[in-house]
């Protein structure tokens, strides 16, 4: 049984100990990871949680600007440094900011590609070691079928994520990749992305 996850409950639980709830998003480039992060941020904001976002993909050209565009539209605080800077340090900065400003949630964007797959996994492992997230979410493209299942398997082996978001989907996409991901990772899919707008994210 992959179990169920109630994000709101978990955040409130952490909030009662006066600590921010930290979510790290993982997945390869092109899957809609950054957009999914923005959708989750918007959802949390609508639930009246305060949110800060860490631009810890310091590898891909344009990644920081893309995230900044989302945070500008959503009127959210972003913590960013320069390209090539240590992503774990960026994530840590965001957590420190959240602690000192009593922010409820820290959402961390991470790289989806580096020189090698092992570089990428090491980097994500370092981020998780430094910030000790409450939740790691894998983002996969529902249209990529087996590729997505293989990515999920690989990421899960290396970084043990807690749950997944499937993008480019529709609310009825309960078959195929979704079932396989749940099976190979023994972890639930919590949301599916069903469109381009910030509200286009639904519980699975």
Residues covered by each model-derived region:
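Short glycine-rich anion-binding loops that position phosphate/pyrophosphate groups of nucleotides
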Residues: 111-113
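Short low-complexity stretches enriched in small and charged residues
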Residues: 31-35, 61-64, 119-122, 146-147
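Conserved catalytic-core segment of NTP-binding enzymes
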Residues: 86-100, 115-204
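Acidic active-site catalytic centers that drive phospho-/nucleotidyl reactions
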Residues: 33, 57, 109, 141, ...
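Primarily NTPase-proximal linker/entry elements flanking Walker-type ATP/GTP-binding cores
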Residues: 1-56, 63-83, 91-99, 104-108
């Amino acid at each position: 049984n992959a179990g169920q996850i109630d994000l709101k409950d978990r955040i409130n639980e952490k909030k009662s100990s006066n600590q921010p709830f930290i979510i790290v998003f993982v997945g390869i480039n092109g899957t809609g990871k950054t957009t999914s992060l923005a959708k989750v941020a918007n959802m949390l904001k609508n639930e009246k949680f305060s949110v800060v976002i860490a631009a810890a993909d310091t590898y891909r050209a344009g990644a920081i600007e893309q995230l900044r565009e989302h945070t500008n539209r959503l009127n959210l605080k972003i913590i960013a440094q320069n390209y090539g800077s240590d992503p774990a340090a960026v994530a840590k900065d965001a957590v420190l900011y959240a602690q000192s400003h009593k922010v409820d949630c820290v959402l961390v964007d991470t790289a989806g590609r580096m020189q090698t797959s092992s570089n990428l996994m090491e980097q994500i492992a370092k981020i998780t070691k430094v910030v000790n997230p409450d939740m790691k979410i894998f983002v996969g493209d529902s249209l990529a079928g087996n590729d997505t299942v293989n990515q999920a398997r690989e990421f899960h082996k290396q970084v043990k994520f807690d749950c997944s978001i499937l993008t480019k989907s529709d609310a009825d996409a309960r078959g195929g990749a979704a079932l396989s991901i749940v099976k190979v990772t023994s972890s639930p899919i919590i949301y599916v992305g069903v469109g381009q707008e910030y509200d286009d994210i639904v519980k699975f």
